[in-house]
Amino acid sequence: MSQTAIIERAAGSMMKPIRVAVIGAGASGLVTAKYLRQARQYFGILDIEVRIFEREDGVGGVYKYKVYEEAEMVSSKYLTAFSDFRVPKDLPDFLPVEDYVRYLEGFCTQFDLWGIIETNTEIVRVSHTANGHRVFFRRSPGLEVAESQDGEESWDCDAIAVCSGLNNVPSISYIEGLENVKHLHSSEVKERTQFGLNTSVMILGVGETAMDLAHLAVTSEAREVVMCHKGGFFCAKKVVPLPVVMQVWKPDPHQKPVDTAIASFLDTAYLPERLQHSNLLWSVYDKTFKALHYLSGGTAAGPDQWVGEIEGERNNVDSLFLVKSDRALPYLNEGNRPQDIFSRIRAFVMNIELKNTSGRKILTAPWPLAFRDDGTVVFPDSKKREHVEALSRVIKPDLVVAATGYVRRFDFLDDGYPEPSELDVRGIWRRGEVTAGFIGFVRPGIGAIPPLAELQAQLWVLNLLRHKYPQQMALHAPDASQGESNDDAIPHYEIDYALKARGGHDLFKSKHGVEQESYAYQLALDMGSAPTFSFMKRQGFKALFTWAMGSNFNTKFRLIGPWRWTKGALPIMRGELFDVVKQTGGGVFFTTYTLLPLLLFGSLTLLLHATAGILRLVGMKERANKMLGTGNIPRREGDNL
């Protein structure tokens, strides 16, 4: 018997099985439970006892219980799908939410999760114990319950994973007199018929849900639809915005999803720290993004977006949640597109295909100051052209829909558990308290929460096991964040992934806003799962091309590292993902958004490395290191939050 086997057997004899409570059976909870259940096959530990507690009667979370008619995903199936369970090829790139719920149900079947999911079970309270945590829960009336006061039960466990979701506690902004009008939170709207017949509908907010609901309203039997916003919005199409040329050449209706089109090589992978931490990277992408929009639609604010432009310092993609639903945009633009001769010529030569709205429009207005006793709206003064029509009318809405988001709050946690702002390890747990993990509570500026939740789950489970089984885990999973690595993994360093604070708004502080590609890559570096160029080169052209020219798909980080799944990950990289990455998105997009940034950052990277090499030759090693890296740690969770 080898020495390693002897050590493993000795460690195994001292191990005690651990119990973990997963709160929530949405995408984040399911993928967390899956990795907890798979830990034995990867690390040789004892089976982990996992229980998933879900308040509703099925899995899916927000995608099943807080959706509306015609809702569909704003992230593509290529990015959204978990690394080892892919969406069938015959389904559309952007899944209707019903299909995504079926996907999650299939995930439960594939990884044998149904037996550990307890539906219709609400978490009442979670408290600390001497050795871990105690979860108090209550099952819905009619279900078999234990004999206890009010049907309340409890379960002691070693760790908890809070996966209750971002969209859990509705937030409705205070407006004086709102009680004088009928109003609903967006989570209460399910279908067009709720808008009524010959009614005036007001939508508060301009996020993705607001856009979808405004579209439902304007295509319903409502008489009037008004959309109110505070500071504007930045619309970004889900697919590459290819224009119609000379009103003759029309692009293929099936276009490349934007979230698959980011070349990660020299964007995250192998970009020197000095460049990655500088403002240059964001500045280039901000300008190329806006240039692409202008070329294809005549306005930098968004593709054919003539209302709601964000003004001042905030108008930068490094500080925004981009709105990826553009269904309402044609109706918002109605009557607002410029009609001067230059604009007409430009639109004739090249423009996004315009949808026929049959004259129906959505009015825009500033955020209401108040609602009078009779229900009429009091607006602030505004000189903006887009607000003229709404402010010239007496607006008396029959229904106000507050698409104003949700609050990050965990009322079931006792005092002593961290607040959202205190999760100072990648927004997942509070340092020194790894037994309480929070999965799925970061929000990307453009991207998707489920794939980030998968990477968070991988990192959290890995560190939980290191905490519980330090000897056993030392044999199986080197700690990349402490400099332990292997030749196939890129050495650990710190990425700048936080959205920036601009114009008095800080989405990183208030909503844990991150840049998808950078945050995903940081988690991969933390685990030692980011493969090197030399490793990818050995996997063949298709895998190398997908790694370099595609986004940071989670499957990319299953090729090496503690959760290595090379046998399954390589075919996905060479097949499904290669097939979408190889699409150029059209010459204008490829040149503007991919080729030019790649050439720029490639040239700067070569220059920095050449300069650093010369400095090393003359014995100035410290100066050489400073040439490539700033030595500064970017803004992190817990920094002045």
Language model region names:
Residues 498-500:
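Hydrophobic membrane-spanning alpha-helices of multi-pass integral membrane proteins
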Residues 74-77, 431:
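Generic alpha-helical secondary structure signal
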Residues 2-70, 86-491, 502-641:
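Flavin (primarily FAD) cofactor-binding/catalytic cores of flavoenzymes
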